[in-house]
C-alpha cells in the first residue's frame, strides 16, 4: 500500500477522549455508508468533514462516556458549530461574549485552557494544544490556517485568549471576561488577529492586516498570531512570518502551498537579520492510539502527495520539451547540489541548524523528482547564438508588438511548423 514518502508531516498523538470521539464518528460513517468497509473504496470529501473537524477538536460530551455510546446519535454535537454551541454560550448576532456553560465547567472544566500539569485542551485537541506550545516557544509571528470556523478558527482563538493572547482590537476579543492576565512579549501584551470570510468574526480585515505587516511588528510586538481561513485569506501577503501551521489537509497540495505562500514571499523577511530569515512549516496530522490504523488526515496527505507526484510527472515532461528549455537551463543552478553551500540559521525557538541552500530533490518545486533534468532534444548551444532579443529591456520595449503578432498568427492557424515560424 502507498505511503507518505516525501511530505514532512507533523504528527500529534490523540488523548483518550479525542481518540474515542474519532472512532465513534468513523463507526457511524460505516453504518451509514457500508461500502467504506471495503479496502479499495475511496472516500468522498463530504464524508470527511466530521472526522477532520474531530481531529481538530472534539468537544466533550458526557454521552460519549457511557457504556452504550455507540447507540447514541450525537455525531454532530461533537464537532464544528453545533459542538461549540453545546459547550459555550455566546451572542449569536455578534459572535462575541463567549462564556463557558455552567454544565461545561461542572463536568469538564475550562476545556480551552493549556495551563497546568494536565492541561484540559490537550484532552480535546492535540493539534491546537501543540500549536499553543509552539507559540509559547517561538520568537516572531505565527500564522495558522484552518478551513473550518467552529471547528478550527474560533477554538484556536479561544485557546489563545485562555493563555492571555487577546484580539488586536480588544472589543473584538471572543471571551466576555478575560480569563488570564495578558501574555507578554518583550514587555508588550501579545495580540492575535483573525482574518476569515465571516464579517461578524472579521469585520475589518484591512485594519488587522495593516497592523500585522507594520514595520514595528518585526517579532510579533503588535500581532503575535495570525489566524486565517480559506475564504478570508486569498490574495493576502504577510511579512516576517516565522511559523506556518496548516491545521488540516486538503485533497491536493495546492491549498497548503498557497497558504505557505502567504507567509513566504519575495523580500518578505528582509527586515530580519539574515540568519533569522526562516519559516518553519507544520502540516498537522493525527496519530491514533490504535497505531495500526491510519487517521483521516494522514490518509488525505497520502492521497494529496500521490496526486502531486502524478502532476509532477506531467510537469516534468512539459519542462523537458518546452521550447525555451535550453534557454532556461541556468534555472537548474538553483539546486542545492549545484550551489553546494551551507549556512547556519536560527529557528524561531532560537535553536540553530546547518541548512543547505537551494532547491531539494523530491520537493514540490522539483516535481517530486531529482531537480536536475535534460532538455529534449538536448542540443549543444556552445556555438555563437544571438541573444540580443533575450533580455528584459527588449521585452519591455516590444511586448505589445509581439502580442499583436501572435494574435494575428492565431487568427490564421493555431498550429505552425518550426519552418513557418
Language-model segments: which ranges?
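Helicase-associated low-complexity regulatory tails and linkers flanking the ATPase motor
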Residues: 1-225, 230-421
Amino acid at each position: 500500500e502507498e505511503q507518505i514518502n516525501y511530505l514532512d508531516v507533523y504528527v500529534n498523538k490523540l488523548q483518550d477522549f479525542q481518540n474515542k470521539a474519532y472512532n465513534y464518528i468513523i463507526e457511524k460513517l460505516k453504518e451509514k455508508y457500508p461500502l467504506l468497509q471495503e479496502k479499495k473504496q475511496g472516500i468522498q470529501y463530504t464524508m470527511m468533514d466530521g472526522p477532520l473537524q474531530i481531529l481538530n477538536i472534539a468537544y466533550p460530551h458526557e454521552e460519549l462516556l457511557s457504556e452504550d455510546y455507540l447507540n447514541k446519535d450525537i455525531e454532530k454535537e461533537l464537532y464544528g458549530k453545533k459542538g461549540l454551541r453545546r459547550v459555550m454560550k455566546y451572542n449569536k448576532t455578534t459572535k462575541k461574549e463567549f462564556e463557558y456553560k455552567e454544565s461545561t465547567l461542572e463536568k469538564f472544566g475550562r476545556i480551552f485552557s493549556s495551563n497546568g500539569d494536565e492541561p484540559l485542551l490537550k484532552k480535546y485537541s492535540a493539534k491546537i494544544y501543540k500549536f499553543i506550545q509552539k507559540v509559547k516557544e517561538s520568537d516572531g509571528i505565527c500564522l495558522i490556517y484552518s478551513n473550518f470556523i467552529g471547528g478550527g478558527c474560533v477554538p484556536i482563538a479561544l485557546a489563545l485568549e485562555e493563555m492571555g493572547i487577546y484580539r488586536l482590537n480588544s472589543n473584538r476579543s471572543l471571551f466576555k471576561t478575560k480569563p488570564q492576565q495578558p501574555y507578554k512579549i518583550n514587555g508588550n501584551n501579545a495580540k492575535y488577529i483573525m482574518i476569515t470570510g465571516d464579517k461578524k468574526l472579521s469585520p475589518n480585515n484591512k485594519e488587522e492586516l495593516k497592523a500585522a505587516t507594520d514595520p514595528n511588528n518585526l517579532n510579533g510586538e503588535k500581532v503575535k498570531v495570525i489566524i486565517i481561513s480559506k475564504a478570508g485569506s486569498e490574495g493576502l501577503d504577510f511579512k516576517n512570518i516565522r511559523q506556518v501551521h496548516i491545521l488540516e489537509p486538503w485533497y491536493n497540495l495546492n491549498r497548503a502551498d498557497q497558504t505557505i505562500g502567504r507567509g513566504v514571499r519575495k523580500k518578505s523577511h528582509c527586515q530580519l537579520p539574515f540568519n533569522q530569515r526562516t519559516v518553519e512549516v507544520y502540516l498537522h496530522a493525527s496519530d491514533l492510539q490504535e497505531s495500526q490504523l491510519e487517521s483521516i488526515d494522514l490518509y488525505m496527505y497520502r492521497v494529496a502527495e500521490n496526486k502531486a507526484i502524478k502532476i509532477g510527472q506531467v510537469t516534468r515532461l512539459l519542462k523537458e520539451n518546452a521550447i525555451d528549455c535550453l534557454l532556461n537551463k541556468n534555472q537548474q543552478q538553483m539546486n542545492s547540489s549545484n550551489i553546494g553551500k551551507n549556512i547556519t540559521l536560527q529557528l524561531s525557538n532560537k535553536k540553530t541548524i546547518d541548512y543547505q541552500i537551494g532547491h531539494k530533490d523530491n520537493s514540490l518545486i522539483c516535481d517530486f523528482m531529482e531537480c536536475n533534468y535534460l532538455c529534449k532534444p538536448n542540443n549543444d548551444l556552445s556555438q555563437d547564438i544571438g541573444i540580443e532579443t533575450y533580455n528584459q529591456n527588449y521585452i519591455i520595449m516590444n511586448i505589445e508588438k509581439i502580442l499583436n503578432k501572435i494574435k494575428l498568427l492565431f487568427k490564421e492557424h493555431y498550429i505552425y511548423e518550426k519552418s513557418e515560424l
